[in-house]
Amino acid sequence: MTDRPTTALPGAQIAGRPVKVGFISLGCAKNLVDTESMIGLLRNTGYQITNRAEEADVLVVNTCGFIDAAKQESVDAILEAAQHKTRGRCQALVVAGCMVPRYGEELAREIPEIDALVGTADYPRIGEVVAGILAGQRVQQISDPDSITDWNFERVLATPGYTAYLKIAEGCDCACAFCSIPLMRGRHRSRPIESIVDEARRLAGMGVRELVVISQDTTYYGLDLYRKPMLARLLRELAQVDGIRWIRIHYSYPTRITDELIEVIVTEPKVLNYLDLPLQHGSNRVLRIMNRPANAEGYLRLVQKLRERVPDICLRSTFIAGHPGETEEDFELLLDFLRACEFDHVGVFAYSQEEGTKAGQMEQLPEEVRLARRDRAMEVQQEIARRRNQLQVGRELEVLVEGRSPQGRGWFVGRCYGQSPGIDGVVLFRAPAGAELKPGDMVQVRITGVQDYDLLGEATEPLTVDGIAQEQDLILPVFHLTRHQ
């Protein structure tokens, strides 16, 4: 990928100099991909990207609207950006992302500093939007969230240069009672395989080693576009891309884990023995209230099947504590389910009431109950995670180097196959004296111990270094005021 401007837009300069644009990106990895895509579009049409708010002529806030805390964080970021417009160099404020389809008009009414609203299906027009507002227009570019958008254009990575998220679809056809994503992102739309593989090749050419495959519902991939599940075939195609070393799967709906998909995990070395399965609860009664199409017994059988077919598979899941209708007995069933499944990594979230959802209209549990149940579930999982980590002691694992560790000279930090970036812990390891390891190197590490959610180890001798990921010109081009994880 080149970062040279292709066709400069009329609004890309002010007084003979390039317009500088700063980004505030909030929410999940899927939102981050949208931000990276907007940055790529603007850079290739003559704009400069800055990560300093005081330098920005234009600020773009890519919002998250998934839960109340994320919405409040987004509003706070918009208000802080508005201060730069009223007191600083900033001339224009753009609000994009998940809050726009649902709350855009309200935001524009309450925060007059907002010059433009950009819907979740309208990112390809970000250059026109910025040019328009710099020409004195107020712009509302909000298409139907179901509009088909293919992100088959250049991105500028906001992740370290060796790792990239690869979004294979947009939207979701599930109707979970607690979830507002279909209201913000529309129905599921799969990207064509050719488009995804082309992007993977470009990312590999930039030095990316690890692809993290994401969407709102990854295992639904292909059912709309090809009328059959196509995730397994897509993974085989991605595994043929030179330069890619690891392929990691996230957001896998459990009822669509096929034997073909499991076979790809077993037989394709690049597809990691790692699977993210958002299961949400362990009580059948609560699962019915949530409108989830499976039951706890089926989930447990799936976990057992995966561990039988892929003995060292690392499983991650997410759960909701305090959902409307959840009794103390239901919650105890959730704890029992966690103990039975023994997931390697778990995120437990206190239920958040969302406007426009079925669960949002039900009688709500007190906030203190929801928070207390979340904390109890995480206490149970913490001990499980420690036991699962202990199983890695004595093994020699391939580790992707991320940098030096603050533990001291000769110590480095990286991740193994069972650790997704930013959420699953790391490997802290010691290398032989004088070892020159760089981010993106792959090394063999013998695991010697466990520290909380992290693994400890020593690089084996002779040290095996498998090349170096290319450094990016702009590793972190996104201006972060705050970041919701």
From Swiss-Prot:
Its cofactor is [4Fe-4S] cluster. It catalyses: L-aspartate(89)-[ribosomal protein uS12]-hydrogen + (sulfur carrier)-SH + AH2 + 2 S-adenosyl-L-methionine = 3-methylsulfanyl-L-aspartate(89)-[ribosomal protein uS12]-hydrogen + (sulfur carrier)-H + 5'-deoxyadenosine + L-methionine + A + S-adenosyl-L-homocysteine + 2 H(+). It is found in: Cytoplasm. Residues 158-387 form the Radical SAM core domain. One of its GO terms (molecular function) is aspartic acid methylthiotransferase activity. GO terms for biological process: tRNA modification. Residues 19-135 form the MTTase N-terminal domain. GO terms for cellular component: cytosol. Its EC number is 2.8.4.4. InterPro entries: Elp3/MiaA/NifB-like_rSAM, Methylthiotransferase, Methylthiotransferase_CS, Methylthiotransferase_N, Methylthiotransferase_N_sf, NA-bd_OB-fold, Ribosomal_uS12_MeSTrfase_RimO, rSAM. The keyword Metal-binding applies. [4Fe-4S] cluster 1 binds at C28, C64, C98. Catalyzes the methylthiolation of an aspartic acid residue of ribosomal protein uS12. Belongs to the methylthiotransferase family. RimO subfamily. This is Ribosomal protein uS12 methylthiotransferase RimO. The gene is rimO.
